[in-house]
């Protein structure tokens, strides 16, 4: 299959990764011989570690042989500090350096459409392609605020990070098994039976 672009870039903090990101990565990968997914990170601003986000993206895109993941660090401790022209300009320089070759296509969401930001940072050598975020209407901010309320948008590879685990300990014949079953029913989840019940 002939790809429209030789080298593409899709960047973000992916903090956390959600199905909208995966949707856009798959679309971008279908258009490029090589797609670089660039994770922006800064120690102190992260809600999930850069290593965790790297693993999530790697495990979600492992089947896409043309997807490469890179990381770029910045020093902005807040989102407001990061969202300034100086940080974006430095970020673009860092991204170009880590990719190390001309970038034909830059992919981003329609929330940036009309700002001219990506065109100024990557043009004219890069075409900026906007993906409509309304196709998968979620953002990382929503998930950070209430993960369980946006559970359907959290990829399966990320869900264990958000799942709550409860361990019930106690002497035998005190009602642990019944309690665990009732909790699982009440919270619409699963449970693991006591090992001793089946093996002893």
Annotate the PLM regions:
Residues 2-165:
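Nucleotidyltransferase catalytic core that binds NTPs
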Residues 168:
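Hydrophobic anchor at the beta1->P-loop junction of P-loop NTPases
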Residues 172:
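The conserved Walker
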Residues 176:
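Conserved lysine of the Walker
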Residues 179, 183:
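Hydrophobic positions on the alpha1 helix immediately C-terminal to the Walker A/P-loop
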